[in-house]
Amino acid sequence: MPNQEKMEKAIYQFLEALGENPDREGLKDTPKRVAKMYIEMFSGLNQDPKEQFTAVFSENHEEVVIVKDIPFYSMCEHHLVPFYGKAHIAYLPNDGRVTGLSKLARAFEVASKRPQLQERLTAQVAQALEDALAPKGIFVMIEAEHMCMTMRGIKKPGSKTITTVARGLYKDDRYERQEILSLIQKG
């Protein structure tokens, strides 16, 4: 579990190291506010995304299931600044095994609430879905803007990073993969 007191002390010292006075009016409560914010932002650290798939049903459904345009934010583990965007999750049920639609978004939320890399986030969500449902195919796509590319370094606001993970049928069958991409890209 996060140690809020230790975080507050570290943030206080960080402000001092910047040459700021952490005791001045505008900064006096900043260590506490920042620590609380990071505890919230990293709330997925002690959770497993696959544990979000608590509702699994046997339905007579053998066609693709897609939840798209899931808004999210996460924190780049290299710079501890946000990246944000939208995720698309698709799977092809195996033997009619489906999950509640909200469970896909919940699993994604848990995986995103930790210091993260977009590539790893994409793979973790795909793995959680594979572990929970063993579907015939999985396709996860994330489109995100990274503040580490917008605010510092190269300074290219508006640039997007797209990552994908395809498993099973969507990895092996080019036609099936193209169909998923087409469905995701439809307005």
Swiss-Prot record:
Zn(2+) binds at C76, H79, C148. Its EC number is 3.5.4.16. GO terms for biological process: one-carbon metabolic process; tetrahydrobiopterin biosynthetic process; tetrahydrofolate biosynthetic process. Pathway: Cofactor biosynthesis; 7,8-dihydroneopterin triphosphate biosynthesis; 7,8-dihydroneopterin triphosphate from GTP: step 1/1. GO terms for molecular function: GTP binding; GTP cyclohydrolase I activity; zinc ion binding. It comes from the Bacteria. Belongs to the GTP cyclohydrolase I family. This is GTP cyclohydrolase 1. The gene is folE.
